[in-house]
Amino acid sequence: MKLRSIFRTIPILKRIYPSLFFKLSQLLNKNIFLSKFKGIYLNLDIRDPIDRSILLFDFYENKQIKYLSKIFKKNTINYFFDVGANSGIYSLVMSKQFPKTIILSFEPVKSTFKKLNKNLSLNPKLKNIKKYNYGLSNINSKLKMKALFKKNFI
């Protein structure tokens, strides 16, 4: 078991570890960290709750990703739509595990789409991902995308 997984399972460590890491990152004036999660490289921002969970505990929707992988293994999946791809975690993990599946990643928020692009660039061997800076809907129209910014993350 990885040390980060142990920190996630022991309640006192689960509370102390993030605080210490966050304080250390502030002292070093460093918020962005390169990390590996499920075989993919990610640029993670300690201020973002999803990134923080991956960075500190090697954990983000692990059960959902495992379930999705099981479905992919049982069936031939030709296309996978990652709608609201965020930073591309699902796209990248599925791409790594299933290189013959064409992955279509949709992320409408420009700043988040830039983060998706950065994470894709950290994994240059994954060639089966097509990315789009669009939102998807059942209505064909052009809308202005608004995102709430809080503590420098969306």
Stretch-by-stretch model annotation:
Residues 1-154:
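Phosphate/nucleotide-binding beta-alpha loop and adjacent structural elements of enzyme active sites
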